[in-house]
Amino acid sequence: MSEIILASKSKIRLEILKKNRINCESQPSNIDEDEIKHSMIKQGASPEDVSKSLAELKANKISQKNPEKVVIGADSVIDFENEIISKPKNRDEALDILKKLNGKNHFLISSVCISKNGSMIWKCTDKACLLYTSDAADDVR
């Protein structure tokens, strides 16, 4: 049994940790991310605040169930013109998002939180400016 838990069902995040020789197990937090995002946005939260809060909520929820373990929570959001672009629910939504972002700057905001005994012990948030340019959305249809 590992001493580290990734509070996520993301296979990519788990793979990144394992490739970097961080032995861990995965336990999804199953928080309602969409509801939390919408509630925070209604209250005027920035995309950075949303990313930070989701990472912390995920880590703390799993940490409360596993107090002796170190728990990593992470979240990423796309900020386009101060609006969060959510994960597409289907192929058409994905193509619409690609068209919307094509040729325009947007930001990837990623947050990581580490919790133990149900409380945050470390956190980090970073923001990268991205420019997506492609005709792929037209080619895929």
Which ranges hold each PLM region?
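Active-site-adjacent loop/tail segments of enzyme domains
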Residues: 70, 76-106
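N-terminal polybasic phosphate/anion-binding patch
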Residues: 1-70, 83-84
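Anionic-ligand binding region
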Residues: 111, 120
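Catalytic beta-strand/loop signature of glycosyltransferases that borders the donor
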Residues: 29-30, 122-124
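Residue-level signal for inorganic ion chemistry
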Residues: 17, 55, 75, 94, ...
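Single conserved hydrophobic/aromatic residue that forms the stacking wall/gate
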Residues: 132-141
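Short beta-strand and adjoining strand-loop segment in the mid-core
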Residues: 82-89, 113, 125-131
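A secondary-structure boundary/capping signal
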Residues: 73-74, 110, 126
